[in-house]
Amino acid sequence: MSAVVLVGAQWGDEGKGKITDFLAEKANCVVRYQGGSNAGHTVEVSQEKFMLHLIPSGILYPETLCVIGNGVVVDMGKLIEEIDGLQKRGIDTSNLRISLRSPVVMPYHKRIDELEDRHTRIGTTKRGIGPAYADKINRIGFRMGDILTGGECFRERFKAQIEYKNRIMEEIYQEDGFDYQQMLNEVLGQAEQLKKYLADTSYLVYTAIKEGKKVLFEGAQGTLLDIDHGTYPYVTSSHPIAGGACVGTGIGPTNISKVLGVAKAYTTRVGEGPFPTELNDFQGEILRDKGQEYGTTTGRPRRCGWLDTVILRYAVRINGLTDFAITKLDVLDSFSTIKICVAYRYKGQLLTEFPNNIAILDDCEPEYIELPGWQEDISAASSIEDLPLNARAYVAKIEELTGVKAAIIAVGPKRKQTIVNSPLFT
């Protein structure tokens, strides 16, 4: 059995797409287990960049089964656009499968998300993700299978839901409502286009694992954005953590063999919320510019700061990480001195564990250690021995502070710019 869960160990944008793409070459099956079109993965292959939002990064390998699990909320229009975009570039999408249980992001979810964000200022992507998950929990949402097999029952439920959403639009937001027939036609048309991809994906993935195939579970966002274990309320509406892989695909935890945490060699965050190691100076600008820290989905500039190992230790605990993949080590090439946060200082007290309260986190000051930089280009390194001594010492310090080995080190965006210290798939 070889089933690996890949999770973001920070606030998302850790480079999961690149690592997933790299591992997918050896995987028989790649599975997305949560999130929606709010996620953004950039994969660079042969001088081409592919920006994926819903489709697993393994789609670039023609022999790899790619699964969108039941934990993913599906914007059918965006998914069709993504499929069409890949096909126009010569990518075969026939190996894609979508769970019949996947909740659907309706047009009204996106409009309500946009209106609600004006008041909450949580900094959502306005893709309708939160409202879609809310309807799922309230048991008033629609699944992919409902639309195609529901018939008159679906139409009646959908009409009632439009009437309900229209009351919300008119009475709460003082906005015009939605046209039932127009939206019904749109939704049914999109579902028909995706019909050939629908399947009982839990059974497909379970069978693949039992047959000894290599399965990679691909998370979106990151540990600190988890709805329960992240910096609430500045979080996403799903479970990016390793436990979410089981719930979001219908696979039991005993089927998982390894959990890989992807972490940048520094830290970034998008949107609102506390960020203890944030750099609001020229060093932060260097990280942003060299790391091209702009959101794949929104284009928003990311907030940048030094590596925070308090966060990483928290990710180790929450996810049960067995290995790390350290990405964008090359972004630190120009620094003469590099800082690592090892603890927080809160009202005179030293905190080595991540606080549960964001009000406390917001008042925390980082406690740093300093390491000498290497100040040379490492983008051509293909083994740990190729790295300068100071770069190796930096990685070793991360391993020491977290108690987890770095199985993978990325020194650039391309597949070949990846150092493997220990194989993930056996």
Curated annotation (Swiss-Prot):
GO MF term set: adenylosuccinate synthase activity; GTP binding; magnesium ion binding
E.C. number(s) listed in UniProt: 6.3.4.4
UniProt GO BP: 'de novo' AMP biosynthetic process; IMP metabolic process
Q: Which residues bind GTP?
A: 12-18, 40-42, 302, 328-330, 410-412
Please explain the role this protein plays, according to its UniProt record. Plays an important role in the de novo pathway of purine nucleotide biosynthesis. Catalyzes the first committed step in the biosynthesis of AMP from IMP.
Subunit text: Homodimer.
Q: What is this protein called?
A: Adenylosuccinate synthetase
**Species assigned in the record:** Syntrophomonas wolfei subsp. wolfei (strain DSM 2245B / Goettingen)
| Gene name linked to the record | purA
